[in-house]
Structure formats: C-alpha cells, structure tokens
From Swiss-Prot:
Essential component of the TIM23 complex, a complex that mediates the translocation of transit peptide-containing proteins across the mitochondrial inner membrane. The keyword Transport applies. GO terms for molecular function: protein transmembrane transporter activity. Residues 137-181 are annotated as: Disordered. It comes from Caenorhabditis elegans. Keywords: Membrane, Mitochondrion, Mitochondrion inner membrane, Protein transport, Translocation, Transmembrane, Transmembrane helix, Transport. This is Probable mitochondrial import inner membrane translocase subunit tim-17B.1. The chain crosses the membrane at residues 17-37, 61-81, 109-129. GO terms for biological process: protein import into mitochondrial matrix. GO terms for cellular component: TIM23 mitochondrial import inner membrane translocase complex. InterPro entries: Tim17. Belongs to the Tim17/Tim22/Tim23 family. It comes from the Eukaryota.
Amino acid sequence: MEEYTREPCPYRIGDDIGSAFAMGLVGGSIFQAFGGYKNAAKGKKLVGMMREVRMRSTLTGVQFAAWGGMFSTIDCCLVAIRKKEDPINSIVSGGLTGALLAIRSGPKVMAGSAILGSVILAMIEGVGLVTTRWMGAMMDPTQPPPEALDDPRSLGQKSQAEPGLDQTRPFGIPTGLPNLS
C-alpha cells in the first residue's frame, strides 16, 4: 500500500523518538504555561508561567519520546514478524505500548491502558486511511473530469438593483445593499 511508505525501521525509531519529543515539548510548554499562570501569585504570573515551562515541559517531552520509541520499536518488530505493514501493526503497537508503560500499576490499569492505546491508534489509522483514500480518488488521473464550470459569457447580464440603493461599493462589497453612510 502506498500510504505505508516510510523510513526503514532502524531510522524510523529514531525519527519517531525525535518527533514525539518535539510534540511533547511544544504541547507540554503550552499546557504548563497555563498551569503556571493559573497557580502563580498575583503580580508574578509571567515568572510563574516561565518557571513551570522551564521545569516541567522537558519532562513531558521525554515521556512522549519514551512512548514514541516504544511504539516504533514494537511496530518495527511486528512488521518483521508479520512481513507486512498495515494498520493492524499500529493498532497492536498502541495497545502493547500502553500496556507496557502501565505494567507497574497492576493488571487492571495495564488492561485499561492497552485498550485505550488500541482505540486511539485505531481511530488515528481510520482517519488516515479515509483521508488517503479520499485524496487518492481526487488525484486519480483515470477519473473523468468534474462537470465544466459555466462560462461567464453565457450567464447573461447582471440583474439591476432596486432604485435608491448605492451601486458603487469598493473592494468587492456586493451592490444592492442599503447605503449606511
């Protein structure tokens, strides 16, 4: 399938770790900025916001990178075992990643994290497949062209507006509106 052409697995893992770290750093900075602003004393809002961003957003980035690295590693292992690359690999990888990251919390939390990871990845894969198929159909050169647009010359004359309305409006503002000036 064309939608699954990516880097080879050893490079994919590093690429996904870096991308996940960047997403976690940016998202964590935004999230921590709101929390720092909300919890800071009056008159110290900016200082509190920057302190929270500096101290906590890198931790969020590292946690995202750990998730991304584990997900990519499991995904690459599944590709090697199954000998094909399809959405099932990503869904199973999301579930196993959620389970492995929650393993110290007990079997109930581990099962919940596995289900949540699988459901989230299934939704992401579903949206990706629908989007790819929809865009692929739009770009298919074998499809007939869309219906021809009407030639402006064949549309006829413009209808006249009611008397007493301003006809000279600049910048593409439609004519036929009452003059408000």
